[in-house]
Structures are given as C-alpha cells and as structure tokens.
C-alpha cells in the first residue's frame, strides 16, 4: 500500500559513476529495444578487461537470447538444445542505448541493469561481474552475435 508523500522536498541523487566502458560501436540513432529485437542473439564468448577468454568460467552467460521490442519480452534459451533456460521476463534498453535492464519472472526471479559496451546490428556486448578462470570475482564482458543456427525458439510465456 502506498499513500502520497507530503514531507520535505526530495531530490534525485547523483551518485552513479559515469558509464564509460566501450568495446565497439553503440548505435544511438535507433531504439536499442528494436536492435535487440531484430534477430536471435548467440552468446559467443566472455572476456575479461584485458581481452582474455574466460568463457569456460562463465557458461551461465552463454545462451540464445530472444527479445521482442513490441511486448518487451525476453527469454534465454539453451545454446545446445534450443529449449528455454527458464529465464524470461521483460526488458528495456535505456540511457541512450547504454543500459539494458531486465526483470526475470522465470525460475529464478531477479532484476539486472547491465551496462552495454557495444550495440549494433552485428554485435551486442554488456559488462557485469563474473569469474576469472581461477574462480575469482572480476568484471567480464559478454559478447553476442546474430545466431546462425537452426533453432527458432518461441517464447514460452
């Protein structure tokens, strides 16, 4: 339950650091939702800030990603089987195509706001916390390219 607030005047904080990571071109003259919705995306690899491949330690980020810009639905599918991973919900790209936010209503309910470091028709990449090959927490970059395989998964919700 919510009621109107009539206390002192509130202001937004300015505490967020600038989002400056970039691994490639970020298209800003087209809706990020529409860019993501143009194709099925294949998570191809995960690298650290020095470009070292850490995909093996971050397999949970490798999947097929489907986005619908009209309904704001997203769903992640298993790369080997094309079956749902049970991670689905709603997404939106905001802040001049610099942030992809999504809320999962699937098996694991969670929300994430991830910095996009590349977004165009050929690739999209985001950064988040992941693991190095020794299991330590590090910043990683998850790369995606348009899917070229035979699966045509449909949303399951």
Task: Describe each region flagged by the PLM.
Residues 1-87, 97-157:
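Lipid interaction determinants
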Residues 89-92:
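Short beta-strand-centered aromatic/proline hotspots
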């Amino acid at each position: 339950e919510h009621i109107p607030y009539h206390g002192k005047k509130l202001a937004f904080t300015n505490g967020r650091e600038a989002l400056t990571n970039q691994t490639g071109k970020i298209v800003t003259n087209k809706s990020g939702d529409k860019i993501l919705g143009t194709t099925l995306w294949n998570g191809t690899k995960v690298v650290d800030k020095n470009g070292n491949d850490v995909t093996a330690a971050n397999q949970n980020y490798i999947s097929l990603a489907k986005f619908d810009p009209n309904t704001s639905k997203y769903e992640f599918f298993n790369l080997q089987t094309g079956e749902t991973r049970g991670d689905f919900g709603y997404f939106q790209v905001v802040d001049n195509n610099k942030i992809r936010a999504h809320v999962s209503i699937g098996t694991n309910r969670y929300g994430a706001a991830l910095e996009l470091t590349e977004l165009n028709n050929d690739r999209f990449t985001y950064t988040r916390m992941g693991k190095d090959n020794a299991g330590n927490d590090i910043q990683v970059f998850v790369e995606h390219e348009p899917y070229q395989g035979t699966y045509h998964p449909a949303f399951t919700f």
